[in-house]
Amino acid sequence: MKRSHINYAVDKAHAIAETFRVCLPDFAYFTADAWRQQDHTLWREVLDLQLGWDITDFGRGDFAQTGLTLLTLRNGQLGSASYPKPYAEKMLQIQQDQQTPWHFHRHKMEDIVNRGGGDLCMQLAWATPDDGYDARRIVGVSVDGQRRSVDAGETLVLKPGQGVCLPPRLYHRFWAEKAFVLGWEISMVNDDLHDNHFLEPGGRFPAIEEDEPVKWLLCSEYARLQR
């Protein structure tokens, strides 16, 4: 991804949050320069757990078609006495017709919620023991406490206010229809480095082309602050 696209995506995310009257924590507004002025000893939880902005094109090179804007608000670390939270929380911003590709989580259970905007469309399929796609097995999920069953690959539509619980090893892909969607993720501890499996090769964190100065550091770039 180009740095200019990342900078613009975070600027746009701030504007969208304001439109939906969603208030964000202070660190969501720290520019790269502002981060350098902070006492990092006071922000160890944010830096160590990579809370903050996460803009990705999943290695596909076309953010408008395949991409996602995330803000990790809370997280923990398994087995850590310093960060014992067993849960995580993220804001998701999904542009109209922008998709997140097929993937599952090996350990994490999560709820994905449509907080407002258009329709959040999702397709589901169980993973096979060798991490393939099980096209035959029926998928049963809970949508706001109501049991729903869908065929593998069938589209489940979440209207604003609806959410679905996704257990581990359940492949899912999703996109927004009719309008932009403000999404939310409530989950077990999140580990994007080790817990994600994508059906097709790609990348969770994008390679970045530095075509303009860094305005917003991504959560995966906090090591720059040590330089």
Residue ranges and their predicted role:
Residues 1-88, 215-221:
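A short, N-terminal "cap"/entry segment at the start of jelly-roll beta-barrel domains
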Residues 79-88, 99-111, 115-116:
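A short beta-loop-beta micro-motif enriched in histidine and acidic residues
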Residues 88, 108, 152-153, 160:
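Short, solvent-exposed loop/turn positions at domain surfaces
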Residues 95, 153-179, 183-188:
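Conserved metal-binding segment of the jelly-roll/cupin
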Residues 129-149, 173-227:
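Double-stranded beta-helix
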